[in-house]
C-alpha cells in the first residue's frame, strides 16, 4: 500500500469516527428530578463508552492485505516472459501438403 492509499484509508476511518461522534446526543442537561438527570447522564455515559470502543476498533482495524489474489495474479502476469522459442519444424506434415488427404468434404 502506498503512502497516499494509507492516508486515504486513515481519512476514511477518521470521517467515520467523526460521523459516529455527531450522531451521539450532547451531554444531557435540563429539567427533571435528580434521579432522572442521573439516569440520563448514565445512559449518555454508556453510549459515549460504546462510541469510544467502536472508534477504537475502527481505528485499530488492520489494513487490508496488499497482496490480494488479484494483485498476486497481476504481478505474476507482469513477470511472464518468453524465454526461449523453439525453432519451427523444417518439414511440413503430409496432411497440410496434400489438401485431398485429411480434409473433410463440405457435405460432412
Swiss-Prot record:
Q: Where is this region: Disordered?
A: 83-108
Report the residue ranges where the short sequence motif Nuclear export signal is annotated in this entry. Answer: 70-82
GO terms for MF: DNA-binding transcription factor activity; RNA binding
**InterPro entries found in the cross-reference section:** REV_protein
> GO annotations under biological process?
mRNA transport
- Cell compartments where the protein resides: Host nucleus, Host nucleolus; Host cytoplasm
Q: Origin, by domain of life?
A: Viruses
Region feature Homomultimerization, mapped onto this chain: 16-25
Q: Name one GO cellular component term.
A: host cell nucleolus
Keywords recorded for this protein, A-Z = Host cytoplasm, Host nucleus, mRNA transport, RNA-binding, Transport
Pfam families (alphabetical)? REV
Say if the entry is tagged with keyword RNA-binding: yes
Q: Where is this motif: Nuclear localization signal and RNA-binding (RRE)?
A: 33-49
Primary location recorded for the protein, binned into one broad class? host cell
What does the protein in this record do?
Answer: Escorts unspliced or incompletely spliced viral pre-mRNAs (late transcripts) out of the nucleus of infected cells. These pre-mRNAs carry a recognition sequence called Rev responsive element (RRE) located in the env gene, that is not present in fully spliced viral mRNAs (early transcripts). This function is essential since most viral proteins are translated from unspliced or partially spliced pre-mRNAs which cannot exit the nucleus by the pathway used by fully processed cellular mRNAs.
Share the domain note from the entry: The RNA-binding motif binds to the RRE, a stem-and-loop structure present in incompletely spliced viral pre-mRNAs. This region also contains the NLS which mediates nuclear localization. These overlapping functions prevent Rev bound to RRE from undesirable return to the nucleus. When Rev binds the RRE, the NLS becomes masked while the NES remains accessible.
Q: Assembly and interactions?
A: Homomultimer; when bound to the RRE. Multimeric assembly is essential for activity.
Q: What is this protein called?
A: Protein Rev
Species of the source: Simian immunodeficiency virus (isolate Mm251) (SIV-mac)
